[in-house]
Amino acid sequence: MKGPIKSIVLGALLACTLFGAISSLRAQAGRGDWTIRKSEQPGKIIFTLIISDRHNRSNHEVEEPLGDFHGVDLSKPGKQNVEFTLARDAGKFECEGFLHDGEGAGVFHFSANANYPQAMRALGFEGIDSEKQLEMAMIDVSLEFAKEMKAERLEGLDTDKLIAFRIFGVSKVYIEELRSLGLSAADSDKLVAFRIHGVSPEMIRYLQKAGYTPDEDTLVAMRIHGATPEWMDEMKRAGYDHIELQEMIGFRIHGVSPEFITELHELGYKRPEPEQLIAMRIHGVTPEFIKDMRSHGMQDLTIDKLVSLRIQGID
């Protein structure tokens, strides 16, 4: 695994670990607070679990079908006291509190499923202590989800990656769609990086239609640096179509923009080579610099000469 991808995923897993650490503040007691509010999606509600102490606070919000909350009736007007449960494979959230016209709050107690760690261990997922089990219940790491991911034969898949998959949205459907587009989609770290940075099937289809066959590291780098399909369309209109993806990434890193290209065109530089544009940005050859050199009587300046002047310290 290459350095940038590894750093990205380690950061993501650190975020997951931090989530678990914060959750552990009250995990021994398995208690916390909850809120409910209406969702814009018919038949669903937005349910938030809150774990906190004097120093830290951790929220986890999910949008779930109303039918998953046994004991909640949103059809009743006014204020009502409620007791309901939300069952997960990892355990059950037993909640009590109040609702008022479809919104409410209260406290919960988490009852861990004693069989869950053993069932997960049988699938190859180790290290599930009480804190991690609460976290896995909150984000709904089900046995079925674990089986689905194991069946995909992914490299580096462990309990923490499984948690990261649920947090960032790596699913069986997502993996299979990537594979249908020709990617191996076999590395757990890269799949997490894909979701963090927004590598989508739509983006891959756009690139393939444009004649590219990007590898997974290039896709992540494009998203990190903002080489989006929309930006690539702008570059195409500026006259830069079908250039290498690494050059596109270089454009974004060094600030080669459609506006920069237009200004150069107005100064007589019709279509500089991609590597020339990058060199100009690296060394600070700006339209203003070109105009200044011309005002001092320097004419017929090629791009290579301009770059050389800047390297020599002429400003």
PLM segments and residue spans:
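General marker for long, soluble alpha-helical cores
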Residues: 2-7, 11, 19-315
